[in-house]
A protein has these predicted regions:
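DNA replication initiation on ssDNA origins
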Residues: 1-90, 196-201
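DNA replication initiation modules
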Residues: 2-19, 78-101, 134-201
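Short glycine/proline-enriched loop/turn "hinge" motifs that connect secondary-structure elements
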Residues: 82-87, 111, 119-124
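Structural recognition of the beta-strand scaffold that forms the well-ordered cores
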Residues: 92-95, 118-121, 129
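Short amphipathic alpha-helix segments
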Residues: 98-116
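Short beta-strand
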Residues: 118-124, 160-165
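A generic structural motif
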Residues: 126-133
Length: 201
């Protein structure tokens, strides 16, 4: 089973290992349900008070959200820093935020992609986390992220948030209808040309 790293909350740097599929199953089964439902109530209440301003609502839950457990999909880390990576998992996460009415359709599109290992609703209830299976080569992580982000935009018409940091945190969530495909097909990476490789126009 593919292993990823988990921290108790955003302030903690010490990591422990957890199976990637075990984490997804915990999102589905409701391990963090009470905490997530409380966060989503705060988010919705702020949305109503702020006239539908999702950015203000996100700011309102930011401090609470950072108390949640979180994983680093990229693999096994000795500490929560890029230089703490011990073994690359070949999994990376793409974030889609502030989706509103676009969420359901976007989730359907992403869940139909053979390269998606998991797709679930974020803690706010207004975003998605899409986890892709990519080649297990840390040297190609940036290109892998760019390829996955491009694919997400092609599938959904929505530009993902930029976040190719190999030690990027993904907070625990609750989604009984999360998509999970432990046999996701590895995504072929498109290599970004270097300055030397780029041809003059």
């Amino acid at each position: 089973m593919t292993k990823i790293s988990m921290v108790e909350n955003a302030k903690v740097t010490a990591c422990k290992l957890v199976g990637a599929s075990i984490f997804v199953e915990a999102v589905i089964s409701g391990r963090w349900r009470d905490k997530i439902e409380s966060i989503r109530r705060t988010y919705q209440m702020t949305m109503e008070q702020a006239g539908g301003d999702s950015k203000r609502a996100s700011a309102a839950i930011s401090r609470i959200k950072r108390k949640l457990p979180a994983v680093i999909w990229a693999g096994e880390f000795s500490k929560r820093e890029a230089n703490g990576l011990k073994e690359y998992s070949g999994l990376l996460v793409i974030d889609l935020d502030h989706l509103g009415t676009k969420l359901t359709k976007a989730k359907e599109k992403l869940s139909s992609d053979p390269h998606v290992f998991a797709c679930f609703v974020s803690p706010s209830g207004n975003g998605l986390k899409a986890v892709f299976n990519v080649p297990s080569d840390i040297e190609r992580h940036a290109d892998a992220w760019a390829t996955a982000a491009k694919r997400v935009e092609s599938l959904t018409g929505i530009k993902p948030d930029h976040g190719n940091d190999v030690a990027r945190l993904c907070f625990a969530s609750h989604d009984p209808e999360a998509y999970h495909n432990p046999h996701a097909v590895e995504l072929e990476i498109e290599t970004t040309p270097t300055l030397e490789e780029e041809k003059p126009t």
